[in-house]
Amino acid sequence: MSTEKFTITEHLVPGSHIREYPGSTVNQQDVLKIHVKNYTPKREGPVPDDAITFIATHGVGLPKELYEPLWDELLDQASGFHIRAIWMADVASMNQSGIHNEDKLSMDCSWMDHARDLLLMINHFRDQMPRPLVGIGHSFGGNIITNLAYLHPRLFTTLLLLDPLIQLSPPSLGFGTDAPSAINYTLWRDDVWPSREEAIRANRAIMQGMDPRCLDRMTKHFFRDLPTPLYPDVEAIKARFGTTADSTTTPVTLTTPKYHELVAQIRQNFNARDPKTGRIEVPRDTHADMDPLVAYIPLYRPEPRSTFRRLETLRPSCLWVIAGATFLNIDEIREGVKICGSGIGGSGGVPDGRVREVVLPGFGHLMPFQEVKTVAGTCVVWLQQEMDRFRQTERQWKEDRDGKSHQAVEENWYKVLKPIPTGRKKRSDKGKL
């Protein structure tokens, strides 16, 4: 249990000012709150100077508490490195953050907002987060943590991307010739049940194969007792299910409302086509990130493609842990691995040993909850290598800086920058008009 291995401290911090999309909040100036958990290992003795601070990001609609068994395994398997703390925040519209913000949230969501929220959180708690920092993200959280690295290239020493949603092609959208997908399921699914027990039974398919530790957290944190703003009338819900009014059984709904999960998965583009002329015109005030070539499609999601296109510039080293049976486009993800960090500003990529891909055959997208030990062990091997490199780099930096002045530039500046001539040539007036 995480409480046996970690001291867990909860925080509520403000989100970043001005959201990416004006429709993310009821009023554009609304201040959102971000619910944060800080997991600090219970240990005897001082914390080593090079102990890692992890910044973690979750998948769409998945409570951050589901990842606690993964933190337990990382701590148990850690060898060649130490853990200072693990920090994880719920996205503003999801889980505990969503509950705190439910009177301010509206029907839009940008993944970029959480990257900015995390940067704000890191600055807020900077005194507790000395280097090295390591980012770890699952699913759309892998995309978000990558964008945080784009925002601040030297922030992270390395990234651990667990089946990240970084690809060029959109998912199946369930219209035209597309088969229904997770997006269709999210919109049309049931989202209220007469009891927690009934909710667990109804959702057993998504819980199938989960580690018992994750399953326990799923039953506690994935559902929420009524009333909620979406379902304020408990008696009406009881009547719908034929439950007596005096019953002590409490109806439940999803902790993250399905509509917030939906708009995080996909974004609407319903107004690009002029109803009078039939012409497609991108409404740039609200949809500037829409590719004009595909603006005829009524749904889109910009971040997977835009993040993929910047992979060459990714500065921190990166481990890609890919689920062999993922529903994502695995071929495109692997193409991303090939170019990751290979361009100007990047880490050097695969050729320099700064990027590695590990495919776990047979594992699905929810592998952090189903194969906890294996996923943790894969990350540990990479962290051992990267921490050895970090220590070597730090030692070399200190040696190179030893004895240097911090008040004046070194002699090489005077060798490279030639002095300005002291004499002035007589000015000619021949060129005057």
Curated annotation (Swiss-Prot):
An example Gene Ontology molecular-function term: hydrolase activity
Pathway it works in: Secondary metabolite biosynthesis; terpenoid biosynthesis
Pfam families named among the record's database cross-references: Abhydrolase_6
Localisation: Peroxisome matrix
Transmembrane feature ranges: none
Residues noted as binding substrate in the record, renumbered to the chain: 60, 140
GO biological process: mycophenolic acid biosynthetic process; terpenoid biosynthetic process
E.C. designation(s): 3.1.1.-
Record region (Abhydrolase domain): 58-246
Enzyme superclass (EC): hydrolase
GO CC terms, sorted: peroxisomal matrix
Superkingdom of origin organism: Eukaryota
Family matches, as Gene3D superfamilies: alpha/beta hydrolase (3.40.50.1820)
Reaction catalyzed: mycophenolyl-CoA + H2O = mycophenolate + CoA + H(+)
Leader sequence residues: none
Record keywords: Hydrolase, Peroxisome
Catalytic residue list: 139 (nucleophile), 163, 365
InterPro entries: AB_hydrolase_1 (IPR000073), AB_hydrolase_fold (IPR029058)
Reported function: Type I acyl-CoA thioesterase; part of the gene cluster that mediates the biosynthesis of mycophenolic acid (MPA), the first isolated antibiotic natural product in the world obtained from a culture of Penicillium brevicompactum in 1893. MpaH acts as a peroxisomal acyl-CoA hydrolase that converts MPA-CoA into the final product MPA. The first step of the pathway is the synthesis of 5-methylorsellinic acid (5MOA) by the cytosolic polyketide synthase mpaC.
Complexes and interactors: Homodimer.
Protein family per UniProt: Belongs to the AB hydrolase superfamily. MpaH hydrolase family.
Protein name according to UniProt: Type I acyl-CoA thioesterase mpaH
Source organism of this protein record: Penicillium brevicompactum
Lineage per the UniProt record: Eukaryota, Fungi, Dikarya, Ascomycota, Pezizomycotina
